[in-house]
Amino acid sequence: MKKLSKLLLALSFVLSVTTSAFAVTVVSWGGAYTESQKLGYGDPTAAKLGIPVNWVDYTGGLSEIKAQKEAGKITWDIIDVYAKDTIIGCDEGIFVEFDFDKDFSPAPGGTAASEDFFTGMPSKCAVGNILYSWNFAYNDATIGSKKPTKLKDFFDTKKFPGKRAVYKGAMSNLEIAITADGVNPGKGSDLTYRKLEADGGIDRAMGMFTKLCNDPNGGCVFWNAGAQPPELLANGEVVMATGWNGRFFNAQMEGTPLVQVWDGQILDYEYFAMVKGGPGDADGSAMKVLREMTSTEGLAGSAKYIAYAPWRKSSIAIMEAGEPWFKDGKTNMVPHMPTAPANTKRYILMNPDFWADNQDEINEKWEAMKAGL
């Protein structure tokens, strides 16, 4: 009997170690955003399914997961990615293709997932996570009596002298520049991308940043992590900063007197993709975790911690019924969503196909432009 008890004890120990060893690794952008994911649906999913969920930070792109696959040592399971990366990753066989309504849960009322998400996915390897904004902000305590209200003010160094914080990559910057230079987005932002694709369009947009960065009254500080723009504004290193609306919102909630300017915002989408051949792909744990995290309740949960809009219509309904939704129990979150009517009077809808088709050529030009500053 004692031998049997010892054997059972040893077996339970082995099983517990085995279970904990096969944690699902989710890769995201770090800072307040990853914290909102972890608290909003990562931890609840782990508790419900009994599958540990680990979070790893990265700075975007597919180079790291490609290196893992080439080395035959894949450690990532689920990656938070841009639309263009789901297209490229799907085409190159990096990500798993989904059977959408089978793999993802319906809304509480029974509506199929494909109908509950706001719009279709850019590839068969993508499931929507959040909708967010590339906009800009300023520090109300340091800006002076004149306040920026339009996107063109970001480039006006006569009216608003001082350095600007600018995203390190070309994506979003070209759309911002061409719009600030007088191009209205048009229906579905078609005009924005037609102007960029026209002869001289890319050079026209990049020229706006060349002028801004070389201006003695201006100057550029390039950022690569979402936490940087609010920090640069708070410490006075820049007078304005492009960034992600959720990061600016969190800084506001922490007491930094930032003001967001929504004119000309770029409404963008973020997606989850599952790595083909990852540790959690083999045993099915990654799909279980992904299904739970992207449920109605899961996506609504992240909006308790950051001002990014969940992809599901049913998630917004839960938020509206549960206001004040923010973690402080006092702040209504729906008005802070980038999709709120007051914030979408003039906006650009990110076109992932444009970037998937042109990013290599554009990025080469962009990096050459930065090197010449």
Protein language model features and the residues they cover:
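Periplasmic-binding protein-like
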Residues: 132, 202-212, 255-276
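Short beta-strand->loop
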Residues: 96-107, 126, 256-266, 276-278
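Extracytoplasmic ligand-binding site segments that recognize negatively charged/polar headgroups
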Residues: 31-38, 82-228
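A bilobed periplasmic-binding-protein/Venus flytrap-type ligand-binding module shared by bacterial periplasmic
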Residues: 135-142, 178-179, 269-282, 301-304
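Conserved C-terminal helix/tail region of periplasmic/extracytoplasmic solute-binding proteins
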Residues: 339-373
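Early extracytoplasmic/lumenal segment of secretory-pathway proteins
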Residues: 24-89
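A ligand-binding cleft/hinge motif common to bilobed small-molecule-binding domains
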Residues: 86-88, 242-257
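Mature extracytoplasmic/periplasmic domains
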Residues: 275-346
